[in-house]
From Swiss-Prot:
HAMAP family referenced in this protein's UniProt entry, alphabetically: Ribosomal_uL2_B
Species, as recorded: Shigella dysenteriae serotype 1 (strain Sd197)
Full protein name: Large ribosomal subunit protein uL2
Assigned protein family: Belongs to the universal ribosomal protein uL2 family.
SUBUNIT field: Part of the 50S ribosomal subunit. Forms a bridge to the 30S subunit in the 70S ribosome.
GO biological process: cytoplasmic translation
Cross-referenced PANTHER family: LARGE RIBOSOMAL SUBUNIT PROTEIN UL2M, RIBOSOMAL PROTEIN L2
Function in brief: One of the primary rRNA binding proteins. Required for association of the 30S and 50S subunits to form the 70S ribosome, for tRNA binding and peptide bond formation. It has been suggested to have peptidyltransferase activity; this is somewhat controversial. Makes several contacts with the 16S rRNA in the 70S ribosome.
Length: 273
């Protein structure tokens, strides 16, 4: 896998950096694990915009990814690695010994032909999934559950991982990439290793059109709007002189947004960035 800078054959190609992975499958995805994925355009069921800057983009099929990894005791072989347009990480198509196929997140170093397994008896190697009470302290893991049996929710993006720093009875303490340290039940599952495709962060789209292909619409500055459209709008010239806020008047810098007090007790240390 490598980051390749394109030749400047046009203004739109001049700054493009692509991530090339020759190990990815070049054919079609596995059809039984595909679902229709309708675009919302950022609108809710009333047709009102609830998330700005979303719309258009190429049609995509959703790949049904197994985040629970609950097929215990049955070994599986990695058939191939695939691109997934719905996430930054690549996915792997695995064939279980009983004939079932599933998609999983592709960890760093996983390749076609490798064997993986889930359950308490699985070996300690990248790609295997175990309850965190059975994983050595100090290990890096990904696809981490926050409730037993719910499926992985933490560390699913390309290049991410979580480190197990302590185990205390029914809980393990995790260090997240943000710097936050939090407790999770020791029976929650996690997959060993870090998510692959870490070079994703080196990608440069190079032109506005590449963002539009991905369904991302332009972001207009508040100072460029009229007073009716934004609190920063209006004025002669480029005067600002206010605390920056959202279009609805909520502070944008430093305002706390977390409201889930029920789980505050599990956070040992707040995030540092």
């Amino acid at each position: 896998m490598a980051a390749v800078k394109c030749k400047p054959t046009s203004p739109g190609r001049r700054h493009v950096v692509k991530v090339v992975n020759p190990e990815l499958h070049k054919g079609k995805p596995f059809a039984p694990l595909l679902e229709k994925n309708s675009k919302s355009g950022g609108r809710n069921n009333n047709g009102r915009i609830t998330t700005r800057h979303i719309g258009g983009g190429h049609k995509q099929a959703y790949r049904i990814v197994d985040f629970k990894r609950n097929k215990d005791g049955i070994p599986a072989v990695v058939e191939r690695l695939e691109y997934d347009p719905n996430r930054s990480a690549n996915i792997a198509l695995v064939l279980y010994k009983d004939g079932e196929r599933r998609y999983i997140l592709a960890p760093k170093g996983l390749k076609a032909g490798d064997q993986i397994q889930s359950g308490v008896d699985a070996a300690i190697k990248p790609g295997n999934t175990l309850p965190m009470r059975n994983i050595p302290v100090g290990s890096t893991v990904h696809n981490v559950e926050m409730k037993p049996g719910k499926g992985g929710q933490l560390a699913r993006s390309a290049g991410t991982y979580v480190q197990i720093v302590a185990r205390d009875g029914a809980y393990v303490t995790l260090r997240l990439r943000s710097g936050e340290m939090r407790k999770v039940e020791a029976d929650c599952r996690a997959t060993l290793g870090e998510v692959g495709n870490a070079e994703h962060m080196l990608r440069v789209l190079g032109k506005a059109g590449a963002a539009r292909w991905r369904g991302v619409r332009p972001t207009v500055r508040g100072t460029a709007m009229n007073p009716v459209d934004h609190p920063h709008g209006g004025g002669e010239g480029r005067n600002f002189g206010k605390h920056p806020v959202t279009p609805w008047g909520v502070q944008t810098k430093g305002k706390k947004t977390r409201s889930n007090k029920r789980t505050d007790k599990f956070i040992v240390r707040r995030r540092s960035k």
